[in-house]
């Protein structure tokens, strides 16, 4: 479970095909009957389903050192996930032939 002020990120390719880590800060958390718990960021991401982000964060932390990484999904940036994502992005941009076809 995240709090206001925590950062979330997503690994994705930009328009030129370069892998990047898109980051934003959670500035609001709401809970409603219709949508459940959601995280809001100021600019980068639309309202995010909190359970999805929490599960993606858990999956990302569990993937460390196991040879895979989660891309195109939003996860919490913390002292484990952010350096792991940044190392993978550096590797993927240096080895684009090996990073193709990843999901």
Model regions and ranges:
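Short, solvent-exposed secondary-structure boundary/capping segments
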Residues: 30-45
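Short, solvent-exposed loop/turn segments that connect beta-strands within catalytic domains
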Residues: 14-19, 34-38
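Short coil-to-beta transition motif at edge beta-strands of beta-rich domains
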Residues: 1-13
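Intrinsic-disorder-associated interaction segments
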Residues: 1, 15, 19, 64, ...
